[in-house]
Amino acid sequence: MADSGSDAPISNRPEEEVTVEKTPEMEAAAEEERLRYLEFVQQAAAQVLVLAAAAYAYAKQGAGPLRPGVDHVEGTVKAVVGPVYDRFHGVPLDLLKFLDRKVGESVQELDRRVPPVVKEAPGLARSAAAEVRQAGLVGTATGLAKSAIARAEPRARDLYTRYEPVAERKAAEAWAALNRLPLVPSVTRAVLPAAASLSARYNTAVADGAKRGSAVATYLPLVPTERLSRVFGYPLADAATSPAPEMQPIPSQ
């Protein structure tokens, strides 16, 4: 007679993984820790740390006769910086979280104060795209451009007049700070002449097309070479003997 013991049969199958469902409290905590607007800063900082550590290890390995001096400097830095780092190593993330929340508040405030016509822009763009598909590209695009400029030009001109000098000054300051980094000046000396030449050729082509009556060239903007030369500190003026003329205004119907 078979043994009728209550022992369950032994299975050789591995135990199934137990999936833990996240509770609303856990999801709320994770959302609180996640950076909504500045997460890319956190990721970029982590990537920079990894690359810097790898580069430092490689340089230290190839230091050769300078290795004892490198070790001495490294030990001194660790002795001085270590206690400070242990005390404040959590500050950057907290600071990022604080700034992230401030960005969120600014976005919400901007959304509240932005004119309704700006909020309607995506819908207007979809409507314009549908109209272009139905009625054809050239005539519709011309009409839409004239209508849009007639409505937006006064506001755009006012905003441009107020903010363009500030943006130009900030760009110049950022460019000056960037050029204090190693290798940047040598790279820009190699790149900017080519950019100046291409800008001059582009401006000349657009101006010639506008003189010949090209409808497309009428709507193409010119590269502001004089303004860029002030920002970059490099003569980006057009290579042509005479500067490119200003764009012709769109004729009104």
Curated annotation (Swiss-Prot):
Q: Where is this region: Disordered?
A: 1-26
The protein's superkingdom reads Eukaryota
Q: Which InterPro entries match?
A: REF
Q: Where is the composition biased (Basic and acidic residues)?
A: 13-26
Pfam families listed in its UniProt record:
REF
Entry's family note: Belongs to the REF/SRPP family.
Task: From the Swiss-Prot or TrEMBL record, give the protein name.
Answer: REF/SRPP-like protein Os05g0151300/LOC_Os05g05940
Please name the source species.
Answer: Oryza sativa subsp. japonica (Rice)
